[in-house]
Amino acid sequence: MSNRTFQRGDPIGHAFADPALLARALRHRSAGTPHNERLEFLGDGIVNLLIAEALYQRWPKADEGALTRARAELVREGALAVIGRTLNLGERLTLGPGELKSGGHRRDSILADAVEAIVAAIYLDCGFERCRAVVLPWFEASLAALPVGKAEKDPKTRLQEWLQARQLPLPTYALISESGDEHAKQFHVACILEQPVARAEGQGTSRRLAEQQAATLVIAQLDSNT
């Protein structure tokens, strides 16, 4: 599966002066070098800056905690993967045979990485101002959907605050297993409470995502017992 040049009217919203940047941004490491991991690294920083700036301007009364939680929600893997699908990146990725066979073009982690790489490619192609103008509209619906200044706290934070409010021991997160190739990891984690006694297991493409899922399930257990 290989990339095609973005045509006028394509959802990405940018015509590359240097098509090689686009090609590299869409080339997964499974397809060999050069691949998009360095662009992904740069794009991660740019996306965080763009979203931080947008939230800072839109939420003048929000405190640091609310801004941080909102940014985390907008740049998480699942949210970026949704953008990747909206931009039709999956069908344009250059993948190795193994990833093609396993449906890598549909995997959240690969799509999220590709979005970050595309952001970096746009930045290198035309500079920060143009990059902001192209990329922020991708996030507009998600930005508008956030309750102003009151971003939903992630499950781990909510669980911790619930326990602290009752002066109970904080949860323990234990790694049960880690599997998969380096670019397609799967983590299996348990969230364990001493008091009240509770345990749940979560899985995800990163340890953080697995812990969040496990915390969500523990919260559901606590809610059902109250």
Curated annotation (Swiss-Prot):
DRBM domain residues: 154-224
RNase III domain residues: 5-127
A single GO cellular-component term on record: cytoplasm
Localization per Swiss-Prot or TrEMBL: Cytoplasm
Gene Ontology biological process terms, A to Z: mRNA processing; regulation of gene expression; rRNA processing; tRNA processing
Keywords: Cytoplasm, Endonuclease, Hydrolase, Magnesium, Metal-binding, mRNA processing, Nuclease, RNA-binding, rRNA processing, rRNA-binding, tRNA processing
Active site: D44, E116
Uppermost EC category: hydrolase
List of residues binding Mg(2+): E40, D113, E116
Molecular function per GO: double-stranded RNA binding; metal ion binding; ribonuclease III activity; rRNA binding
Reactions listed under catalytic activity: Endonucleolytic cleavage to 5'-phosphomonoester
InterPro entries referenced in this protein's UniProt entry, alphabetically: dsRBD_dom, RNase_III, RNase_III_dom, RNase_III_sf
HAMAP family listed in its UniProt record: RNase_III
Subunit-level organization: Homodimer.
Function: Digests double-stranded RNA. Involved in the processing of primary rRNA transcript to yield the immediate precursors to the large and small rRNAs (23S and 16S). Processes some mRNAs, and tRNAs when they are encoded in the rRNA operon. Processes pre-crRNA and tracrRNA of type II CRISPR loci if present in the organism.
Similarity section: Belongs to the ribonuclease III family.
Name used for this protein in its record: Ribonuclease 3
Source lineage: Bacteria, Pseudomonadati, Pseudomonadota, Gammaproteobacteria, Lysobacterales
